[in-house]
Amino acid sequence: MDDLMDFFDSSKNFKRGTLPRGCISGDPNAYTSESSDSKPIKREIIGTKDVNEIVQKEQQLMNQLVGGPSNTKRTKTLDELESDDDDKMELNEAPTVRSDEAFYEKYHFDLNRNRSLPIYAQREQIMKAIKENPVVILKGETGCGKTTQVPQYILDEAFKKREFCNIVVTQPRRIAAISIANRVCQERRWQPGTVCSYQVGLHKQSNSADTRLLYCTTGVLLNNLIRLKTLTHYTHIVLDEVHDRDQDMDFLLIVVRRLLALNSRHVKVILMSATIDTREFCKYFASCKSMPPVVAASHGRKYPLVKYYRDQLKNINWKTEPQQREPGITHEGYRDAVKILLVIDNMERKAEGQSEQSYEEAKRTGSVLIFLPGVNEIDTMAEHIEHVMNESPNIKITIVRCHSLMSSDSQEDVFQPPLSGHRKVILTTNIAESSITVTDVSYVIDFCLAKVMHIDTASNFSCLCLEWASKVNCRQRAGRVGRTRSGRVYRMVTKAFYMEEMQEFGIPEMLRSPLQSSVLKAKELDMGGPSEILALAMSPPNLTDIHNTVLLLKEVGALYTTVDGVYEQLDGDLTYWGTIMSRFPLDVRLSRLIILGYIFNCLDEAIIIAAGMSVRSLYLSGQRQRTSDAFWMHYIFADGSGSDLVGFWRVYKIYVNMCQNLPMKDSEVQWARRYNVSLRSLKEMYLLVQELQKRCAALNLVSLPVGASHMWHDREKSIILKVIIAGAFYPNYFTRNNKTIPDYDRDVYHSICGNDPCRTVYFTQFVPRYMGELYTRRVKELFLEARIPPEKIDVTFQQGSEKIFVTFKGDDDDYMNSTDVVQVPGRVTTEVYKAIRMRMNNPNRSLRVMDQNSALKYVQQRNIGVVQDSKWVPPSKQWNVELLTLPSVFDKKITGLITYIVNCGKFYFQPRSLAERIASMTEIFNAPEQLSYHVRNASAITKGLQLLARRGSKFQRAVVLKVEPQSNAIPQFLVRFIDYGDWALLAMDQLRLMRHELRRDLEELPPRMFECRLALVQPSSVTSYSNRWPQKANEMLSKLASCGPLELEVYSLVNNVAAVLIHMRDGVLNDKLVEHQLARRADEDYMSRKDHDFRIRKQKMKRYVPAAEQQQVNEEYLRFNQLPQDADLEPPPLDKCHTSIRLKGPYSPLENSMNSMLRIGMYKSVAIEKESVNAVLLDADPQDRHDQMIVAASVTESDGNDKLVARGTTLMPNIHGFGALMAMLFCPTMQIKCNPERTKYVCLLAGLGFNPDTLEPYFQEHDMVINLDVGILKDDIRIINQMRYNIDSMFFNFDANELPAVGVEGRLVIFNQLRNLLTRLLGKDRSFIERHVWNSKYVWEDMSDLEPPSEPYGKRAIFPMHGSYDLESEDMGNLLALQENCSELYDWQNFDGVMQPRNCRLCNETLESVTQLRLHLLTQLHRDREKQVGWKQQ
């Protein structure tokens, strides 16, 4: 018994790993700084009870279990017993089982069992063991019949005695429970759902009272036993596949063992598995008087199986190296596996004459299964095999990949025969250990590796770690061969390493996976605290992991921070949120998403998203998806939201609608293939959605009845979904890390030579001497891979630079208000995203060019450009800038007409000064001689042709955009009016061809209008979707334009687009849009501010500059504003291009990386999973210097613990302060800190809180600091507190044992209050504030001098009220000093020399030069600060 007690001694070191903080992953050396915030976090753990005492008490209960014949007599009906102790009977006295004669008369019982199954030989021994022992262990190889036959043996025995029995058999997988139950019914000729039935989740085959044999998933039985708290509902409990050791199974073993000893001593427990560790299970269920018997059933092996180890293969020519200790595959390892393939091929070739089987037949039936740890290793192995095939054409191999991310179609390839004359080699992960059986496999090459998911319980970051596989795994892999013919297994480790170093069994899930589910089940079991219950596990987790899990459950609202009002480290009372979470087969954060969906009345959407996050690989993954446009289907479903989760919701809704409208099965297959969707995963997701909806209904979580007053509009829903995502996945918050870099915006434009960063990418490593303009068309062709047509691309070069600039043109379809099929967030065009995705797939592009001398001869022979001093000057367009209709640099205001409006960000303006010229042109166009050139033949009209087209009652010049498909034989043409900007779809009779003379005169005449956009504003993220201007804003502009001439104030002119302010009688339209919450104030980008600064300085000097000089300066200004033009030359023939250049790119200056906002992730690099819509992470609003938050549904950690990977990401709305507001709304608690003068809130520290006595944080790993960059006011904190109160009210009940009492009417009131409060909170126009830096930002402060806020729900609040200091008025002396500083900065504004660095005290920024100072004074931050300190320019 000493050995047994030593086994149960949880004070011994049950470590998950050797890492600090009691975590399974996380490297203290990963931190890059020695600051106090970056040092490894350590926490002292003190349990509430001695673990030994817990284990000893449990063992005393087990010791009361006595085996022997007396247990077969029972004095009471077991299915009616609450407890064996109910009648205070003697220990050895058992209830008598009632007769079940009526039941046995009702159904046919055939007692002839299948004698050919190996298990049959052990039938008598099995039944004897069950009869005499409370616990029996049955070890039987796969296929021996134990799962189907043993329960029938028990049932047959009861039939013979006419005794009642009720058998439950658990299965780890749903499909197994269903298929086995149906197989038993078929074998016994029972109607399914009668004698034998199944239950998976909430789905029962029937509710028949006649069911005596129930197959169910492990979780079903576990939940039943937790609810009943007794085993006596069953006579026999059969736990199958117990070797799986997942958390449900380990916790079920705790419950069964506890209840068996406590109140269910006469229930029989049978443990079954093919690879069970019998010694461990015997010890676990041993009592002082007996050990559970082990019955073994084996059927032997029909065909021989030979195993080889690396050191036994002396005849293979490879390097003799010592066995590596660190798990991994070296380059030599891959080559050695290829050598084994060659040895197999030679062996079968030589055996052809000595065997009845031909060499070709041996190849066909001699497939090779290579076990590799992951997809990357599969790809590397495939490359090595392909390399050998390329060098040796006689080696013919068909490579088949097999992993969990494959489509179902690809999985079928595993079972297909190879091509004629080929050998099939299957490269697989451990999925083929048990899930897939391939009959033609004769050889296994096993690298003895596996990737196992571990969890760092302190950070909640999971990590897929490469490890040596267990011997059990290796034996299962070896079992894939030798089934239909003899087989060989090659293990790529030495025999000594395999026998002595590798573990017999893998690490149980409870020691490496999240414990949230187990802790919640322990709370529901209510037989002790989580640490006490989990100490009874077969492999108990250490106290640190239990403590971390309890902290995490407190963070998500599943547990209160206290037990009966007193704080407990290792425990907390269960909340109703926790009860809900325990009923869902989901991660607790996904359950939290459903709860918030219920509260904010988007329950269906939340359920769908949660289901989408729970199934694997909704989108297909593979070579095709990396190289084609299939990936962009993710963006189509995300619809510009920047959210993988919203994409899941939309793809599901489209799929369900399609299934309802398309009855043909082939249609859904074609749809799934077209949109790169895994149909299998979608169907699994559909079933999970149905399951979750049933579970919600059982908990009375249903959507509010349909009504206009409480339904979200589409615009609102796009925001509210992101709000509940931010709430559900707090604190997985990330920010982009380049927004605070000084001169960020200047560097962006500098890197692309002043081009528009929202439309431009660039390549590097082009050699300038190769005369790049000759190859512009070749560069454009590189983008055909991304389906970007060459006509939408301009390619330019900068003299002496190694960069090639690629700018994507605006689409003429903009004039129809159409949108791209692929929507992306913000201002950046879709083509830029596609270009960056191209580089992610392949970072190098090859471009064939001529050498310099040949190229010079080539251009001279063809008169392309000019060669001067052995340097080529390419042809370029000469700008007649005096003809451009663009505002002069000296003109601040212009009067004229808005001729056409696309939206507030794009409209066209005709200056009044051109009125006479336009009238004259109209008169010429409409002269009879010009209108006589009718279009006789539609083929004469081509895209790009200039002609005359009817606009209203007059003809105007136009250009053909598109020839529309003919309908009813009447061709129509889409034209754009050159001098007005609008477009029309016209028939042939409304068009006129231009006379040659007229076309010649007007061909070079630029449009008599210019493009404009509203300055200093952008669409409000609250009222618009994906940076689109709201319809109401466009209507306000249209109404103003219809009133006649307008006065524009030109802010800047960049790329021939004027940023303007439109003056009205009662103000400025730009400001009115902000007042109506249709727009928000915004900074202008760097080039716009630079141009504005230049313009205002020129306008100040206007009175001193003569008119002729003004014209000269303006022409120079306009000429400078024109960007280099695409030469678009015919490239030299490829047979003349003998030099190949490897271009790198394309790149964008707007590419971002992320930082974790959690303390534990501060110094780790962050990447986004490659399949995400945010994998290409660009600064979609480069002019906006505010942080835009990204939320991840889950975070994994690299094997080296220095890199985080964010999965299921969502880009939050670009609402200033949104990240801080969401953290305040959904964090457990927070402290909002003031500046030293207490005049403004500047920083918030959010987390689980702190010990009021020591000020030590409870969960410092998850503490989060957010430095505020906008004003947060006391009123905002009041609104947030009201929202937190309403969220708590939805589920609160003063009696913890009852369900929440809020009915439909109460829910409606709460929902409408939440809706109004959220609208107020997000709709505010917040002023910018300067950033503050704190040395002690992670320190919780003693705020005992602050009057605590009233707490309506006391310590039963999941979201307690936030307290905060009242703000003081700004000190007058300080205000005067800031005003003086501001005046000094404006004095330096006109200085033209070299300036020493100066500080802007208003904004806490250092200004290095006069140019930087001038542009800083134009920022929204500085303008807001001027208002805040009361400074006005004289």
Swiss-Prot record:
EC primary class: hydrolase
Gene Ontology CC: cytoplasm
Catalytic activity entry: ATP + H2O = ADP + phosphate + H(+)
Gene Ontology MF: a single term: ATP binding
Top-level taxonomic group: Eukaryota
Positions bound to ATP: G140, E141, T142, G143, C144, G145, K146, T147
BP terms from Gene Ontology: meiotic cell cycle; oogenesis; regulatory ncRNA-mediated gene silencing; spermatogenesis
UniProt cross-references to CDD domains, sorted A to Z: SF2_C_RHA
Region named Disordered: 66-86
Record keywords: ATP-binding, Cytoplasm, Developmental protein, Differentiation, Helicase, Hydrolase, Meiosis, Nucleotide-binding, Oogenesis, RNA-mediated gene silencing, Spermatogenesis
Keyword Ribonucleoprotein found: no
Domain Helicase C-terminal, residue spans: 354-526
Domain Tudor: 938-1001
Record-listed E.C. numbers: 3.6.4.13
Keyword rRNA-binding carried by entry: no
Motif (DEAH box): 240-243
Function as written in the Swiss-Prot or TrEMBL entry: Probable ATP-binding RNA helicase which plays a central role during spermatogenesis and oogenesis by repressing transposable elements and preventing their mobilization, which is essential for the germline integrity. Acts via the piRNA metabolic process, which mediates the repression of transposable elements during meiosis by forming complexes composed of piRNAs and Piwi and govern the methylation and subsequent repression of transposons. Involved in the repression of LTR retrotransposon copia.
The name this protein goes by in its record: Probable ATP-dependent RNA helicase spindle-E
